[in-house]
């Protein structure tokens, strides 16, 4: 059952996903994004930043040098990224996880811009 308008919208969405090959594109861009997060984590320090995710649903978990969840750093990074034009929220019980869920149409340029801004914000936060 369902409303005809809702069904029509769902079918149009499915056609768009298929015609633009968005599932495969999502997997490709997600891997690129995750690889960039891993490189960034290596520069910042793996004990401080732990990237993970699948497709375009990615996260970066932040810790202090003593291993404690770094909710304060996550909040500072979120505020800095907001001022740079990126919207994200800290997640998890201690709020030390930066979650990234870009649209399926995100491109390499946008990912690169976000990684640069994130790198600056993390560097400032951990200094």
Regions found by a protein language model. Give the residues of each.
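Conserved N-terminal phosphate-binding loop of PLP-dependent enzymes in the Aspartate aminotransferase
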Residues: 1-127
């Amino acid at each position: 059952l369902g409303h005809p308008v809702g069904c029509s919208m769902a079918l149009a969405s499915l056609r768009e996903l298929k015609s633009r090959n968005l599932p495969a594109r999502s997997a490709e861009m997600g891997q690129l994004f995750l690889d960039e997060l891993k490189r960034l984590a290596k520069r910042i320090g793996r004990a401080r930043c732990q990237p993970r995710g699948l497709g375009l649903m990615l996260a970066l978990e932040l810790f202090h040098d003593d291993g404690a969840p770094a909710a304060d750093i996550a909040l500072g990074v979120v505020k800095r990224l907001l001022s740079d034009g990126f919207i994200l929220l800290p997640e998890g019980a201690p709020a030390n996880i930066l979650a990234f869920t870009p649209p399926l149409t995100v491109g390499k340029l946008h990912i690169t811009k976000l990684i640069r801004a994130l790198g600056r914000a993390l560097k400032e936060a951990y200094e």
